[in-house]
Amino acid sequence: MSIKIGQASLGETGGRNQQPGNQTGRELNISNWYNGRWLGVLRYKSRKKAERAAQTCEAAIKNRNIGYDMSDRNTAYEAARAVGWDVSKITKPVETDCSALMMLCAVAAGCASVEALYRRQGNSCTTYCMLHDWPATGDFDLLTGSKYLTTDANLLRGDVLVSEGHTVMALEDGKNGEGEKEVVEKSKIIVDGKEIKIYAEKNAAD
């Protein structure tokens, strides 16, 4: 049985120039994990932020005032900011898209550097921006091993899966989730010509 994922998928008739709000009930939705030819998984270094992001994603999906439309993709973000990032309090119809929803969730979770990206760009990130800019914020690890991209077994709640044109959030831990939280990953870097071992704990605290 696959884990559940949250996503913004498609408007009532397509991707652009849609009616505000979730007209079909499936524009934002919870679905089963699938192999979407993922290029990377963005994992929150803080489990607390991961949980806040997942809760925001779930709340956005439940709020039928939030729909899908690439043309007005930032209106949900601005509405969320106006209510202190509690998306359940959005009472007027607004829009988002797949990557704009993930950005909203990250900012609601307390990722100040992601919020700074939005301010600098004047726009939510695309999937390209997510893969290239989010790891540099310090809030995320970018995981590209096949065990994260081709199966849900090693995913954690709050993980953000990114492909060339779509992004979703894991809303449950995979079957190996406990091991993922506890494992200490050994990596190596070269400093002044010398190899130095670095140990990074996956379930880093705030």
Residue ranges of model-derived segments:
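Short alpha-helix capping/helix-loop boundary micro-motifs
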Residues: 140-153
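A short beta-strand micro-motif
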Residues: 4-8, 161, 187-191
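N-terminal capping segments
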Residues: 1-119, 164-166, 197
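Short, low-complexity, charged amphipathic interaction modules
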Residues: 182-206
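Short beta-strand-centered aromatic/proline hotspots
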Residues: 166-174
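Short, basic/aromatic beta-hairpin or loop at an interaction surface
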Residues: 112-143
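Loop/turn positions that initiate beta-strands
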Residues: 155-159
